[in-house]
């Protein structure tokens, strides 16, 4: 029963995060990122490291946020905190070390990661509770 809940939480959180990030990176903000990052961006992202990132990041979200949560509000708040830390370390490191990585990109991506992680963790929690009968 716990394994079923964990699997549902993982799949639900992963699908939510992929949908959100796909819309953000692929549809809504693709031209903005291209304009702001220019030559730093590949024409097509490398699928293997992207897949490993999503699987690993969502695993952390499920272990540290979704499964320990008692309410969706707690999952949202703790998810936002995880997103704030994870995306903050990524964006601040890039700003500190890469030519062409601006404060604008840092703040935009950091805010997005915080929001997307909060939403994905909330969705993962709600679906795990509903479908996992917990």
Spell out what each predicted region is.
Residues 3-134:
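Juxtamembrane/disordered regions of integral membrane proteins
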């Amino acid at each position: 029963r716990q394994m079923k809940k964990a699997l549902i939480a993982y799949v639900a959180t992963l699908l939510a995060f992929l949908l959100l990030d796909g819309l953000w990176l692929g549809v809504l903000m693709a031209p903005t990122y291209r304009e702001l990052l220019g030559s730093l961006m590949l024409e097509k992202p490398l699928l293997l490291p992207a897949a490993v990132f999503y699987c690993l990041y969502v695993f952390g979200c499920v272990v540290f946020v979704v499964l320990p949560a008692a309410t969706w509000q707690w999952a949202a708040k703790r998810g936002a905190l995880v997103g704030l830390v994870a995306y903050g370390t990524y964006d601040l490191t890039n700003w500190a070390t890469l030519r062409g990585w601006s404060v604008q990109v840092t703040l935009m991506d950091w805010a997005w990661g915080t929001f997307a992680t909060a939403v994905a963790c909330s969705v993962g929690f709600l679906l795990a509770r509903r479908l996992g009968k917990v």
